[in-house]
Regions:
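Metal-cofactor-dependent catalytic cores
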Residues: 1-201
Length: 201
């Protein structure tokens, strides 16, 4: 189980999460915004805009660097979450195995920024097999699968080194129409812990 406190930045692995109607509590609760008010995401950032972005190691340094450039730094809480689509993303182990076969190498699942990673579900081979399905996680949580996730350039970044591998997105586009994983909406909120079963209702 993973949570990403700041959209498009590294996530954290958790053994227990609280799922609210709007998704995992604390997930993508913040985003970096540019002056236009748009969220700064991995889709737009290529690491070339300003080399100083790579040298900021703590909050004080970041604020000082912004002040030197005459940039106003402020916090806003206008949106509860910054999702691309739905509040929960799910990846099944067989889908990861298929992506690894297509790409010809081992892939860290964190590259795809899922919230939930689960084992195989009976009768489910591709994302399309799960569309519209209701899922039960643990004793209480219920989710509905809404759509397959169409992947963007973010998956080309290694989650540890930030090294870029464009071949991953190309391979997924050729054999999977660039889709990997599914989005889910929350039907019944609750708490789930690592190891809770995920079942099709």
């Amino acid at each position: 189980m993973y949570r990403y406190p700041v959209k498009s930045l590294r996530g954290e692995s958790l053994a227990r999460v609280e799922i609210a109607p709007g998704g995992i509590v604390g997930d993508r609760a913040a985003a970096l915004l540019v002056a236009s008010g748009h969220a700064r995401t991995g889709k737009a950032y290529r690491g070339k805009e300003d080399e100083r972005l790579h040298r900021l190691e703590d909050e004080a340094t970041a604020v000082r660097a912004a002040a030197e450039r005459g940039v106003l730094v402020r916090g806003e809480r206008e949106a509860p979450h910054y999702f691309d689509d739905s509040p929960i993303s799910l990846v099944l182990a067989p889908w990861l195995e298929d992506a690894q076969r297509i790409c010809g190498r081992a892939l860290d699942v964190r590259r795809f920024r899922p919230n939930l990673v689960a084992d195989a579900l009976a009768g489910v081979e591709r994302e399309s097999d799960l569309l519209g399905a209701e899922l039960r996680v643990g004793a209480r949580v219920r989710l509905r699968v809404t759509k397959a996730i169409r992947r963007c350039v973010t998956v080309t970044y290694d989650p540890e080194s930030d090294a870029v591998d464009p071949g991953i997105l190309r391979a997924l586009a050729q054999e999977r129409e660039a889709t990997f994983g599914v989005y889910c909406e929350v039907l019944v909120p609750g708490t789930i812990v690592l190891g809770d079963p995920l079942l099709r209702s």
